[in-house]
């Protein structure tokens, strides 16, 4: 006869679920409102979503205080793991989401924002990403990954452009393949160690001195491929330009930030112990992936004729940059990862939001792209403020001081040198120089060429709604004045990373 199992509510520590339950309950609340009052103005759903995210942010602040006083918090049969990595990444996820949602207050022709399902799916997606970063259990990571991914596929398809459904299908196909790779890699590690918890997997493999190195490499390759799809690492990046092009510019900017920080955290938890295992092949595989991703993405970005696709390849290169922090594997590099991505979030979301200002409802028959370089030619004459702000974001992405990403790149390359990866730091510097060309190319078009279409100015002014101006203004202020807070930000991030044992 089986003995009874006694589980106390205190041992479950259900408070660890609060940051995830808030967006889930909020999404269900929006659906219920729509059931009873289906003709509500979309601004109600925007305000509700912002309120829900604000409450979620407050809950994260409370979790940060508990972590600062008590250290890592475990809950729900030790499946939930609330440490510094989880808290910092959730701040980025929720913060970027709060910057994205007001963009829904735009013209009615972007009809996906008129549906309450859009906001409910968006909140479910956020909860999925929060689960991903708040556990070291491979099963729960997979559940969070699929929850977020399925919602994101639908959000892409809801955009009312011809390429949106194609983009959603491509993303779904690649996502399904990534899910298969993740499942197989997890299965290999479970077969080797009898556990699906990353901490236990590390303990067992270390105790066995990596005796089954062949199977370990198989598991690593499959998991790296899964992360490669989610992080757009070469050669798993092929979906990225097409999906970004088929999505709205704002959603593309959001996709370049939030899904990737979730994947970065899972990769950091998993590869941190593998890189320090002393098995040189594990390090070599990741090293090659980082260098190839940074370099090839920059080369492809150089030859793009569409600004949106250029920014898509640029995002791939930046993801390779940040993966270098995981390869280096020191507290300084892991702190640099968060610093870099926080600063990148302001700059890249601002860049894609500027593309949204230049959007057109109906493209001319001869025009295949809504964001060709020619469209930005002479922008300083038709809309000088828009040209100046776009130039600001391009200079930051290029790493030009004193703008935001300069500090992220410097701190990351410094961590590479300190960690003994001097050659990698040189490769990163070289790639930054290459990237500078295609960022400055757009600035040249805006400031040194004559307008191809003389009346483009009315397009910018018509599209620049107050919410869009506000978000771009916040992004621009963060990009310009990052140097004021960068030292305090490094100290804050390092404290949380160090106290998490990374």
UniProtKB/Swiss-Prot annotation:
Q: How does it sit in the membrane?
A: Multi-pass membrane protein
An example molecular function term from Gene Ontology annotations: quinone binding
Q: Which residues cross the membrane?
A: 16-36, 47-67, 85-105, 113-133, 138-158, 172-192, 213-233, 248-268, 273-293, 310-330, 337-357, 387-407, 410-430, 470-490
**UniProt cross-references to Pfam families, sorted A to Z:** Proton_antipo_M (PF00361)
Its EC number is 7.1.1.-
Q: Which GO terms describe its cellular component?
A: plasma membrane
InterPro entries assigned: NADH-Q_OxRdtase_suN/2, ND/Mrp_TM
* Keyword check for NAD: yes
Q: What does this protein do?
A: NDH-1 shuttles electrons from NADH, via FMN and iron-sulfur (Fe-S) centers, to quinones in the respiratory chain. The immediate electron acceptor for the enzyme in this species is believed to be ubiquinone. Couples the redox reaction to proton translocation (for every two electrons transferred, four hydrogen ions are translocated across the cytoplasmic membrane), and thus conserves the redox energy in a proton gradient.
Can you tell me which family this protein belongs to? Belongs to the complex I subunit 2 family.
Q: How does it assemble?
A: NDH-1 is composed of 14 different subunits. Subunits NuoA, H, J, K, L, M, N constitute the membrane sector of the complex.
Name of the molecule in the record: NADH-quinone oxidoreductase subunit N
- According to its UniProt entry, this protein's organism is Sulfurimonas denitrificans (strain ATCC 33889 / DSM 1251)
The opening ranks of the lineage are: Bacteria, Pseudomonadati, Campylobacterota, Epsilonproteobacteria, Campylobacterales
**Designated gene of the protein:** nuoN
């Amino acid at each position: 006869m089986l003995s009874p199992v006694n589980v106390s509510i205190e041992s479950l520590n259900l408070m660890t679920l609060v940051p995830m339950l808030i967006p889930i309950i909020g999404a269900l609340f929006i659906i219920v409102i729509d059931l009873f009052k289906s003709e509500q103005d979309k601004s109600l759903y925007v305000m509700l979503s912002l309120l829900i995210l604000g409450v979620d942010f407050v809950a994260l602040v409370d979790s940060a205080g508990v972590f600062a006083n008590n250290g890592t918090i475990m809950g729900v049969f030790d499946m939930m793991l609330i440490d510094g990595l989880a808290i910092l990444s959730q701040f980025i996820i929720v913060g970027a989401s709060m910057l994205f949602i007001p963009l829904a207050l735009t013209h009615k022709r972007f009809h996906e924002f008129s549906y309450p399902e859009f906001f409910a799916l968006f909140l479910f997606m956020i909860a999925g990403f929060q689960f991903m970063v708040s556990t070291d259990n491979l099963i729960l990571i997979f559940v969070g990954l699929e929850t977020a991914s399925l919602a994101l596929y639908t959000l892409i398809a809801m955009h009312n452009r011809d390429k949106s459904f194609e983009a959603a299908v491509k993303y779904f196909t690649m996502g399904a393949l990534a899910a298969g790779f993740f499942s197989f890699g997890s299965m290999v590690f479970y077969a080797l160690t009898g556990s699906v918890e990353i901490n236990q997997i590390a303990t067992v493999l270390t105790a066995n001195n990596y005796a089954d190195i062949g199977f370990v490499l198989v598991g690593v390759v499959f998991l790296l491929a899964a992360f490669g799809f989610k992080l757009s690492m070469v050669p798993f990046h092929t979906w990225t330009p097409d999906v970004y092009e088929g999505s709205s510019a704002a959603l593309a900017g959001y996709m370049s930030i939030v899904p990737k920080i979730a994947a970065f955290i899972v990769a950091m938890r998993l590869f941190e112990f593998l890189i320090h295992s002393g098995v040189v092949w594990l390090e070599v595989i990741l090293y090659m992936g980082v260098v190839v991703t940074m370099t090839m993405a920059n080369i492809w970005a150089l030859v793009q004729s569409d600004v949106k696709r250029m920014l898509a390849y640029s995002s791939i290169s930046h993801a390779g940059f940040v993966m270098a922090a995981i390869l280096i594997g020191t507290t300084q590099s892991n702190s640099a990862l968060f610093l870099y991505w926080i600063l990148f979030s302001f700059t890249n979301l601002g860049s894609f939001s500027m593309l949204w200002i230049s959007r057109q409802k109906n493209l001319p028959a001869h025009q295949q792209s809504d964001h060709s370089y020619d469209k930005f030619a002479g922008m300083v004459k038709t809309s000088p403020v828009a040209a100046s702000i776009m130039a600001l974001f391009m200079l930051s992405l290029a790493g030009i001081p004193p703008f935001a990403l300069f500090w992220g790149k410097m701190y990351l390359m410094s961590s590479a040198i300190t960690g003994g990866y001097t050659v990698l730091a040189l490769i990163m510097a070289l790639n930054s120089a290459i990237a500078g060309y295609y960022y400055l190319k757009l600035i040249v078009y805006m400031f040194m060429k004559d307008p191809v279409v003389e009346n483009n100015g009315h397009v910018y002014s018509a599209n620049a709604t107050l919410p869009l101006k506000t978000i771009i203004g916040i992004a621009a202020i963060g990009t310009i004045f990052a140097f004021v807070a960068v030292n305090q930000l490094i100290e804050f991030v390092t404290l949380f990373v160090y106290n998490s044992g990374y």
